[in-house]
């Protein structure tokens, strides 16, 4: 029983991360990365230099990621003519699975990228959050907003208590910056 309660406590901590203040990340400059899309195209973050970039870290089995996907498409449709790009980075899954379960299922108009080893996702993980977990796991269902200068202006980590399914906070920050 004690083991069960301990595991329950640890798992609830893992899924109750708070959204970090935007101020915590304003000095963080994102390093360029290069990943293949589900269509086989190589996509570099540098390709979006001069644009705002919304990045969502996902997996096909993550229920929070799946719920947010249609809202990411809405953000893309609303903002792509306003110098804003949207990307999903899927962590450690096959191209065929991701294409079917994310790109096609949600009819996404923007690139879905494959982070086969989780290295890019892990590079965004704050070092002070759940240090015992793999860095790429911490970033699942997270959203980032990178400004045209390559600096993080918004980061939300999964918070099941205050889950922002419609991405209201992300859109609010994007509107402030535009």
Residue ranges of model-derived segments:
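Short hydrophobic alpha-helix segments
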Residues: 46, 124, 154-156
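Short active-site neighborhood of thiol/selenol oxidoreductases, capturing the structured segment around
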Residues: 44-66
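Sec-dependent N-terminal signal peptides
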Residues: 3-13
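Short loop/turn microsegments at loop-to-beta-strand junctions
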Residues: 30-31, 52-53, 140-142
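Structural microenvironment flanking redox-active thiols in thiol-disulfide oxidoreductases
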Residues: 67-108, 119-123
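Short, internal strand/loop/helix patches
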Residues: 102-140
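Thiol-/selenol-based redox modules, centered on thioredoxin-like
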Residues: 138-178
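N-terminal "domain-start" segment that seeds a small globular fold
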Residues: 17-45
């Amino acid at each position: 029983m004690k083991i069960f309660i301990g595991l329950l406590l640890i798992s609830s901590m893992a899924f109750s991360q708070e959204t970090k203040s935007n101020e915590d990340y304003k000095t963080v400059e994102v390093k360029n990365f290069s990943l293949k899309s589900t269509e086989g195209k190589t996509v570099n973050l540098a390709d979006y230099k001069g644009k705002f970039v919304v990045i969502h870290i996902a997996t096909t089995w993550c229920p929070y990621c799946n719920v947010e996907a249609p809202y990411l498409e809405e953000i893309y449709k609303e903002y792509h003519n306003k110098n804003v790009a949207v990307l999903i980075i899927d962590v450690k899954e096959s191209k065929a699975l991701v294409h079917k379960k994310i790109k096609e299922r949600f009819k996404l108009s923007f690139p879905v990228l494959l982070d086969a080893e989780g290295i890019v996702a892990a590079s965004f993980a704050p070092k002070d959050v759940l240090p015992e977990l793999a860095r790429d796991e911490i970033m699942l269902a997270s959203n980032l907003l990178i400004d045209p200068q390559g600096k993080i202006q918004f980061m939300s980590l999964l918070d099941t208590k205050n889950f922002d399914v419609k991405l209201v906070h992300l859109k609010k920050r994007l509107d402030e910056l535009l």
